[in-house]
Amino acid sequence: ENIGPVNLNGLSLEKAKLRLTNRFKKVYPGIQSRKTFLNISVGIPRAIRINIAGEVNLPGTYNFSAFNTLYNALYVAGGITENATLRDIKLFRNNKLISTVDVYKFLTEGDGSSNVRLENNDLILVNTYSNRISIDGAVKSPGKFEMKDEETLLDLLNYAGGLSENAFKKSIKLTRIIDGQLKVVDINSDQFDFFKPSAGDVFQVD
């Protein structure tokens, strides 16, 4: 009797053996009664070719083992350039977009689901960033952060590690070009969770 295909992708050797045993014992009673045993081993993994394009330091086509992931590929390609997006890395398979990777999810939340396992002839495309927002002063990790259109000042504060212990928490100064003029306004704390930063904004936490 045909047991059909068994997907072992991403499993350890022990978990793969358990899954195969559970599948086989439905067909072969000897396995369930422990009169017959199942052994598995891993041979040399097959090679896959991955294309990496866009804002990486060493774009091109690379050979990997079949167990490699998107982040491994970016590392081998020399990492991303200064102008690269971290929020919109695209993975194409068979000429179709199958995943849009937001590295911030991994860096800030530990969400490893974005580290997709690669398959032969995949294309990784790293575009340029859309906009970056600066935040300086009394935050734990000041700097420039790439922001999505729907994100708020509260999101920016989270990316910057939050306010420092000695920060003035009631408001944050925003420097923005409005009607061709540079203006400074205060954003009060009750606005943090809905105020949306724009490209070129500079926030200062006192």
Could you tell me what each predicted segment is?
Residues 1-206:
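Ser/Thr/Pro/Gly-biased, low-complexity, turn-/loop-rich segments
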